[in-house]
Amino acid sequence: MRKLKLVMVGNGMAGVRTLEELRKIAPDMYDITVFGAEPHPNYNRILLSPVLAGEMTIQDIILNDLQWYADNGITLHLGARVTEIDRRNRSVIATDRNGQTITVDYDRLLIATGSTPFMPPFPGRDLPGVISYRDIKDTDEMIDAAARYRHAVVIGAGLLGLEAANGLALRGMAVTVVHNSEWIMERQLDRTAGKMLQAELEKKGMQFKMNAQTAELVAGESGRVAAVKFKDGDSIPADLVCVAAGIRPNVELAEKAGIHCNRGIVVNDTLQSYDPRVYAVGECANHRGTAYGLVAPLFEQAKVCANHLAEMGIGRYQGSVTSTKLKVTG
C-alpha cells in the first residue's frame, strides 16, 4: 500500500508536536517531509530567555535532534525557504541553503509557519544593531552585543520585552525599557500590579521610560544605531535596540496560495483550512477568531490535528483557556 505524502512547512514546536502525536498513532501512514527556515532542528523557543540570561545553552533547549528525524524516517530540509504552495498540483516549492530549488508533492499539507515579529515603521529600523527577539539568531546577536557594547534599549514591556531586558541586564548592559503605556504588561496586569513589578525590576538595575513614543532610531558615525529619539524630543543612547512590539501570524505563503486568512490561517475544529487537504497549527492559525501564541493551546491543537491526519478524526479542538508566566524575577 502506497504511503500518503505529508509535507510540513515550518519546523517549530507546534508542528513537530503534531508529527510526534501522528507517529504514535499512525507510524506507517505517511512519508513525511519537513521544511525549516532556520538551520536548527526543533527547539524550545520559550527557553531562549534563559539562554540569553546565561542560564542555559542552545544545546540545552533542542527538543528534537537530527537523529530523531532520521529515526522517524522524516526528510528534513533545514535552512530552506518555501517560496510557493501550488495547490492545483499539490506541491511545495522551496529554495534550499545552497540556492537549489526543491519541489515536493503532497497528499496532505501542514502549515506551521508560526509568527513574525512586528517591527513598527519608524525611521532607522533597518540599522545595524536593531533586532527583534524571536529565534536563536536574534539571541546570539544580543549575546554578542552584550559582550561588546554598553547601552541597550528594549522597545515594548510585554512578556518578551521584559525577558529580553532581564537577560541583557544580567549580561552587564545598562538597559532602558521603553513602553507606550502607563504601566508594564498592561494586557496581563492591572495598574497596581504593573507598578509593583516595575519597582522590582528597577531594583535589578533596569530603567523605564513610560508613555513614550519612538520617533526614530539614530545612527552613529559607524553607521550602527547610537540613540533612540522620541516624539517629545527626548533621546537616550542605544548601542543595541531590541524591538518587542508584538507578533503577527506568518500567513504570506498561505495568502499567496489562495488559502483564506483573517489574522491567521482560518481553520475549523479539526485544524483544516478552507482547503481540506491543508491543515494549520500554531501561531499561524486562527481558530474561532483567536490566534494563540502560547504553548499549551498549540499542543492541544497538535493532538487534534494528528488524530485527524491519522483518520481518527473524532476529536475536535474547542479553543483554550490560557495563562502566562514571566521568567525574570526569581
Where do the model's predicted regions map?
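FAD-site-proximal beta/loop scaffold in flavoenzymes
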Residues: 126-149, 220-229, 233-307
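Short hydrophobic core segments
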Residues: 9, 104-114, 155, 236-246, ...
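Phosphate-coordination loops involved in phosphoryl transfer and adenosine-cofactor binding
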Residues: 3-5, 79, 148-151, 211
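Glycine-rich dinucleotide-binding loop and its adjacent helix/turn
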Residues: 113-171, 267
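Mid-to-C-terminal Rossmann-like scaffold of FAD/NAD(P)H-dependent oxidoreductases
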Residues: 1-5, 24, 284-330
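Residue-level detector of alpha-helix initiation sites
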Residues: 13-16, 39, 115-117, 137, ...
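A Rossmann-like FAD-binding core segment of flavoenzymes
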Residues: 31, 73-97, 104, 170-267
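Beta1-alpha1 glycine-rich phosphate/pyrophosphate-binding loop at the start
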Residues: 2-75, 167-188
